[in-house]
Amino acid sequence: MITRYSRPDAAAIWSQETKYKIWFEIEAHAATKMAELGVIPQAAADAIWAKGKDATFDADRIDEIERTTKHDVIAFLTHVAEIVGEEARFLHQGMTSSDVLDTCFAVQLARSSDLLIEGVDRVLAALETRAKEHKYTPTVGRSHGIHAEPVTFGLKLAGYHAEFQRAKRRLITAKEEIATCAISGAVGTFANVDPAVEAYVAEQMGLQVEPVSTQVIPRDRHAAFFAALGVVASSIERLAVEIRHLQRTEVLEAEEFFDKGQKGSSAMPHKRNPILTENLTGLARLVRSAVTPAMENVALWHERDISHSSVERGIGPDATIHLDFALQRLAGVIERLNVYPENMQKNLDRLGGLVHSQRVMLALTQAGVSREAAYAAVQENAMKVWRGEGAFLDFLKADDRVTLPHDQLEALFDLGYHTKNVDVVFRRVFGEG
């Protein structure tokens, strides 16, 4: 986890303090149910809660113990015993370290999911506001990076809004799949712990019961979770790259906000660089880097091994914290994005009407010209424009193969033709015109 790219709320989920608090809650809730089942004395369960619920667990002391035990959960339980006293012997009855570690990991990922969903909601709100603001702002659509046909800037943003709606659904599904609890004991047979304990702990921790845990929660769940994060990161990158392209000097249709006092270059005082969206492109790579290791964690040996552990200690906090940061940064960029409709119009006009070539070709075919002949006539005149020899409309009017009346030809260059169905798309995306 890189502090520079983290928010306090997201980082706090992965702090040692939070982790040990969750570990204690799992152990204490298990003790509560065991007391109800008569496995341990009720007085012991009460004492565990009374002495431990407000305790501050000393990470340095736990690390000190672990240097001897070489086992983090045992080190934690030893430290808890120092706080709770004699009743601590009733903790962890019939449980394994994976019961604690995997359930805690599920809690942390679920809580992180809530922040990520909040981040997507902010992105969605920003996109909706800006899309409606520029619903009819004409701009050029590009394919292969080359001018194609007119669109509206609002329509472009509506497409991203639809994509982030899907991102939200993916995160909700990912949370549902990862939010599972396993308190099943060695090799997952419940031989030494009643299944009712697992059900109770799951309920208290806001999780679902893992149907079959083999001492660990199956890692296909985690693979799906991190894959979902990777897709969301790619959606962030797609919009970030779009903004970066639109900010290029020769395009300049949109631009990141540039605050008073901000500097763009240590050498060139004139620079206004798209540093935030460049940063988002890099963060997306970091988040996606978690996907392959998560996939490789699925194939554990038999009922369990710990080859996944070192991986998850890294990708859990890193991927969630960085994605949380990226979503909030992206929302801020959209909210404050400088949009330049006048430059959009200049770029639309730059090729002298070539963006209307398809409409001219279709009009010719409807007037009785074969598609092949219509394509050839339009393309030949378009190539003259590419070479800077004149205006597209003038060439078309002078071409005997173009049999359309001049007033009809001129009408084909109307931008409104390309925006006539914007309302339809907006209703699909936003549920309104």
Question: Model regions: which residues?
Answer:
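Amphipathic alpha-helical coiled-coil segments and their boundaries
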Residues: 102, 109, 113, 157, ...
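Short, well-ordered beta-strand elements within core beta-sheets of diverse protein domains
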Residues: 155, 223-231, 359-367
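A helix-coil-helix interface module used to build multimeric assemblies
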Residues: 1-184, 190, 194-200, 209, ...
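Catalytic-core signal marking the mid-to-C-terminal active-site face
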Residues: 1-18, 55, 68, 75, ...
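Acidic, glycine-rich loop-and-beta core segments that form the ion-binding/anion-interacting portion
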Residues: 198-291
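A structural signal for small-residue-enriched, beta-sheet-centric alpha/beta enzyme cores
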Residues: 189, 204, 209-216, 345, ...
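Alpha-helical support elements that line or immediately flank enzyme active sites
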Residues: 31-32, 108-120, 229-238, 243, ...
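Amphipathic alpha-helices that form helix-helix packing interfaces
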Residues: 30-33, 116, 120-123, 127-130, ...
